[in-house]
Design a protein with these regions (language model features):
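Non-catalytic terminal extensions of ATP-dependent helicases
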Residues: 291-353
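Conserved nucleic-acid-binding Ia/Ib motif block in the N-terminal RecA-like helicase ATPase lobe
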Residues: 1-61, 69-72, 182-200, 209
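Hydrophobic residues in beta-strands of the RecA-like P-loop NTPase core, especially within AAA+ ATPase
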Residues: 50-51, 75, 224, 234, ...
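Conserved interdomain hinge at the start of the Helicase C-terminal
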Residues: 141-189, 329
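Short regulatory helix/loop adjacent to the ATP-binding pocket of P-loop NTPases
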Residues: 62-65, 112-122, 185, 227, ...
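Conserved segment of the helicase C-terminal RecA-like domain
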Residues: 248-289
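A short beta-strand element within the Helicase C-terminal
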Residues: 69, 230-245, 267-271
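Post-DEXD/H (motif II) to motif III coupling segment of the RecA-like Helicase ATP-binding lobe
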Residues: 15, 19-20, 65-137, 276, ...
Length: 353
């Protein structure tokens, strides 16, 4: 049983497991997904269950998960899973797991203490934070941190100027409130800039579509709450922008962890208002000079098509490629990332087509 704090992380882990564990039954359970489909899949005990605390607790409450056969529990991003907002569900999940022989807790940030209900007996800690082999760099080494001062409390114009100064690349902008995410996105959209919003107040399909368009380069910009800070593996994120200051060092670490991945380099920018002070954990940031004449903003190279059919309708990537090449007269190299969900699919194609 693998527990994760967000739907997107559950889907990501489910996708990876299906690639490396072909032939093994896996069930993914999360809010916004069909309870009926999950219940049907759980009727015959799977080898792996991946899910979010609320949905897993609900299935356990209703007797849909066979607890006697569970022998391994994994808490990914455990410090978040065990935070106050999830503790009731987590206690409800862990308490009846009498036959679990192994508990594995993973995160990029440590936790000073663990709730008693985790019932860890003589835990062994493996700490890879900051460790390296000879001649090997860590993500922190490959991350350049910059400071930008906004002359007024409203940072929108400063953000816009920064975006014009960045060469094309995937850019994650972090805000502390959902309303701010929507406001920043609307500001950019009103100026003809393609940008996606991503936060917990959006419907599941809208969240999946936003991440898909960001991953497949239909949008270079995604504005998000800290929902996007943990665990999500979005390749090639070049820039992190802290529109709002992180609430703490852990948030800062997880936000920045979306870039400088897999030996790539990344850049993070902190925008400070007139009365804001740089946090102690970011005092090494270098001042970034805005060039008012710079204009590197470009329209993304891809656009996303939506197909109203997915896995449950037996649609494959080959079906979509065949349709686009035969009916749409597209060349194979004009088709980008294809993502097939349960009942719908997304495909990126070159925008000029």
């Amino acid at each position: 049983l693998v527990i994760v704090p967000s739907r997107e992380l559950a889907l990501q882990i489910d996708n990876v497991l299906r690639k490396i564990a072909a032939g093994i039954k896996i069930v993914c359970c999360y809010g916004g997904h069909s309870v009926r489909e999950e219940s049907k899949s759980l009727a015959v005990a799977p080898a792996l269950i991946v899910g979010t605390p609320g949905r897993i607790a609900d299935h356990i409450r209703r007797g849909r998960i066979v607890l006697e056969t569970l022998d391994t529990l994994v808490l990914d991003e455990f410090d978040k899973c065990l935070a106050l907002g999830f503790q009731d569900e987590m206690q409800e999940i862990i308490a009846p797991l009498k036959n679990v022989k192994k508990k594995i807790l993973t995160s990029a940030t440590d936790s000073e203490s663990l709730p008693a209900f985790t019932a860890l007996k003589k835990p062994v800690k493996l700490n890879f934070l900051g460790s390296r082999k000879d001649n090997e760099t860590t993500p922190t080494d490959r991350l350049s941190l910059y400071r930008i001062d906004s002359p007024i409390k409203d940072k929108l114009e400063t953000l816009l100027a920064l975006l014009h100064n960045l060469k094309p690349g995937l850019t994650l902008i972090f805000c502390n409130q959902r309303e701010s995410v929507d406001r920043v996105r609307q500001f950019l959209t009103d100026r003809g800039i393609i940008a996606e919003a991503f936060h917990g107040g959006m419907g599941q399909a809208d969240r999946e579509r936003a991440l898909c368009k960001f991953r497949n380069h239909s949008s270079y910009i995604c504005i998000s709450t800290d929902l996007a800070a943990r665990g999500l593996d979005i390749p090639e994120v070049k820039y992190i922008v802290h529109y709002h200051l992180p609430v703490d060092f852990e948030s800062f670490t997880h936000r920045n962890g979306r870039t400088a991945r897999m030996h790539a380099e990344g850049e993070a920018f902190i925008i400070l208002g007139p009365t804001e002070q740089m946090p102690e954990y970011a005092t090494e940031a270098t001042d970034f000079r805005i060039d008012p004449k710079a204009d590197f903003l470009q329209t993304p190279p891809m656009a996303t098509f939506h197909f109203a059919a997915g896995k449950k309708e037996k649609i494959s990537k080959g079906d979509i490629v065949g349709f686009l090449t035969q009916k749409g007269k597209l060349a194979a190299d004009e088709i980008g990332l294809i993502e097939i969900k349960d009942h719908y699919s997304y495909v990126a194609v070159t925008r000029d087509k």
